[in-house]
């Protein structure tokens, strides 16, 4: 992976505009497209209430070719019936037509409030004047335009060989992806073998976006896409996978630390599991525990809540509490040792000091085998409750 300052990938253009989805008049409509043919890899939500955007995208990426995506923020267009499906098709078709592309090469993604129709009159008015954007780049504008309750845009750039990879993402709530993420779009001018591109993309997504959880709620609109137009030539697949992992992990940490009302990033490192799947399961159980989340928020060195959360994995009968080790940062808190009152006070003080940081690391060694997985989340605050209790009001 190159250390040079990454630039914009060749051949990608961005258009953003306000079309009435957002109440504050900000840009809420985004088109990201490649001027050259591109291969595409994508993963989507497994929600049984998936929106029409997800359904249309699944169909479009089946042949591994796509040139772009239109993103509508502040309206999920989910649970909107036949009208919502027809509106999604109309928007996608109109964008493709404006750019002179086959409809099947344009994807569509939506995010925001569920159960509301698109404001089609204002969208149609904007689509009448849509054309290819002038000049390459604009990913920073796209990262901002796709936001909903995010407090900041999320963008990352990485150089790999002679190519550039850019990633943007949104999402801070309703976030526990299942083979997808919230909305994440990667664009690269690297040339990749389509089959290998798909394999490495799925591997990276599983280790990054599928490892983050804010509130255990899986979105109906989760979509992650990688476009590769090849204008920079071939790159080593292994190097590209490393670059993609670096970019995706940076976005994951940014999402987790920007969780609705969040003040702290929580990283749970599970080792010594029977396999990686067990490690992931234990890590998710810990990072999703409201008691663990609130303890982290309050800097309360109540490490027993982590032990409680591990114990909830009752189907994992090979977990033996006498073999488990728990630590906060570098401070080992379990198994218990005969320390004396002063030593116990010092231990709690050391844990509390670690919890006062912006990033909290909880380490768990199950001492069963060599399975390992790291998951990411955030603390639970009054801000989360306030924001979600007033979301549509």
Swiss-Prot record:
EC assignment: 2.3.1.35
Record site feature (Cleavage), residues: 180-181
Keywords assigned: Acyltransferase, Autocatalytic cleavage, Cytoplasm, Transferase
Protein origin, superkingdom: Bacteria
Example GO BP: clavulanic acid biosynthetic process
Outcome of swapping residue 150 to G: Results in a 50:50 mixture of unprocessed:processed proteins
InterPro entries named in the record: Arg_biosynth_ArgJ (IPR002813), ArgJ-like_dom_sf (IPR016117), ArgJ_beta_C (IPR042195)
List of catalytic residues: 181 (nucleophile)
Pathways per UniProt: Antibiotic biosynthesis; clavulanate biosynthesis
PANTHER family for this protein: ARGININE BIOSYNTHESIS BIFUNCTIONAL PROTEIN ARGJ (PTHR23100), ARGININE BIOSYNTHESIS BIFUNCTIONAL PROTEIN ARGJ, MITOCHONDRIAL (PTHR23100:SF0)
Role played: Catalyzes the biosynthesis of ornithine by transacetylation between N(2)-acetylornithine and glutamate. It can also use L-arginine, L-glutamine and L-lysine as acetyl acceptors.
Assembly: Heterotetramer of two alpha and two beta chains.
Protein name: Glutamate N-acetyltransferase Oat2
Taxonomic source organism: Streptomyces clavuligerus
